[in-house]
């Protein structure tokens, strides 16, 4: 888990930048994303010289001739509109970009999943699963990606292992990505997560 939806989206952009082989500096973000998410991505990308292209995917995306690092889409949009993003995802992939789908967990009980739609990364807030609004937080975010990208993920990853008694044990995995080993070359500076809230959301989902 990560701190909130906007932070998770910005970390996803960072993952895409690490994986990019085209040397482009352009990122597309749909204007149907939450305004706070757009602003936070702007704040995180500007110091790295990245160009953020914000617009309507149906009209604006086709006008972009260059390669993209990634495209950030909302599913559903911030106003609740539900549209099939498959064509947009295909367009971004044709421009050699990864696709980040900001998703609503509860809606995914009925809608196609990001994986089924062809997205590379799925992020969002787990607040809908049993967490009070709390005047804006705290809310845990979720972050999921393809197996092939796991070594570029931000934050800490908990893996399942076996202890010396042969019982299942949970431990930190892939720690060579983190600050205490890679220092300035770490995949992220995220040092914490909303673990308690993530557990509450998981328990809520299991119960229901």
Task: Label each PLM-derived region with a short phrase.
Residues 129-208:
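Active-site C-terminal subdomain of aminotransferase-like
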């Amino acid at each position: 888990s990560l701190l909130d939806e906007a932070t998770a989206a910005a970390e996803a952009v960072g993952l895409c930048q690490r994986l990019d082989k085209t040397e482009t500096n352009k990122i597309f973000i749909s204007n149907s994303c939450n305004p706070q998410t757009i602003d936070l991505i702007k704040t995180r990308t500007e110091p790295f010289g990245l160009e953020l292209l914000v617009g309507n995917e149906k009209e604006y995306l086709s006008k972009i001739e260059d390669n993209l690092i990634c495209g950030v889409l909302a599913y559903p949009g911030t106003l609740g509109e539900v549209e099939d993003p498959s064509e947009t995802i295909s367009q971004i992939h044709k421009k050699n970009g990864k696709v980040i789908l900001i998703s609503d967990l509860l809606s995914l009980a009925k809608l196609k999943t990001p994986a089924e739609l062809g997205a590379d990364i799925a992020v969002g807030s787990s607040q809908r699963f049993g967490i009070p609004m709390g005047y804006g937080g705290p809310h845990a975010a979720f972050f999921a990606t393809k197996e092939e990208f796991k070594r570029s993920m931000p934050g800490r990853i908990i893996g399942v292992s076996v202890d010396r008694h042969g019982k299942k044990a949970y431990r930190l995995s892939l720690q060579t990505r983190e600050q205490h080993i890679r220092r300035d070359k770490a995949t992220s500076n995220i040092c914490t997560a909303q673990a308690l809230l993530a557990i509450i959301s998981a328990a809520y989902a299991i119960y229901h």
